[in-house]
Amino acid sequence: MNSRQAWRLFLSQGRGDRWVSRPRGHFSPALRREFFTTTTKEGYDRRPVDITPLEQRKLTFDTHALVQDLETHGFDKTQAETIVSALTALSNVSLDTIYKEMVTQAQQEITVQQLMAHLDAIRKDMVILEKSEFANLRAENEKMKIELDQVKQQLMHETSRIRADNKLDINLERSRVTDMFTDQEKQLMETTTEFTKKDTQTKSIISETSNKIDAEIASLKTLMESNKLETIRYLAASVFTCLAIALGFYRFWK
């Protein structure tokens, strides 16, 4: 490693970048083993599990060999040790950052198991909720059915009562009309009987009056006949008297 590469490491740490430049082939492949990039999703009820000990998270390499390598490339011992110390600190910081952003396969499996357990709990809760809702719906349906039956019974009772009341009213009205018709017929019969009686009485009175008139006419005729005879007699007597007087005067003058 030369001074340019070490300076790049210092600059990257100073800027706060999470990317660390390193020469190709100097870091062991064990640093990249058993790491998987994951996307952190908030909102899951999961428990963070840390199964990697702290001593296994540190970058372990032969610092003495690295110091000797730096000395062979033109650095003195103090500079080489300073660079190795800085590289060790940067490696530890980088590993801490990597462990914060990446998980191991075991951690991923545990997280997946926790998520599956959480999903199972949610599924169970959904099943329980569905059963509870179904039971509530069934109870509500039964309650509505009972209420509908009660309303149906009430409607049937009210219908029967109204029908009975209407039938009773119709029968009463029919009886009243029949009684009224009977009374009217009775009054008509009484009126007819009274009229017939009055007519009979009137006819009897008329007949009696006619008979009286006929009797009076007959008596008047008889009286007129008798008066006529009396008048004739009187006239005859008068004529004879006048003739006798005339004969007397005639004889006297003669």
Curated annotation (Swiss-Prot):
It is a single-pass membrane protein. It comes from Homo sapiens. Signal peptide: none annotated. The chain crosses the membrane at residues 231-253. Residues 129-164 form a coiled coil. It is found in: Mitochondrion membrane. InterPro entries: CCDC90-like. Keywords: Coiled coil, Membrane, Mitochondrion, Transit peptide, Transmembrane, Transmembrane helix. Residues 1-42 form a transit peptide. Interacts with MCU. The gene is CCDC90B. Its main location: mitochondrion. It holds the Pfam family CCDC90-like. This is Coiled-coil domain-containing protein 90B, mitochondrial. GO terms for cellular component: mitochondrial membrane; mitochondrion.
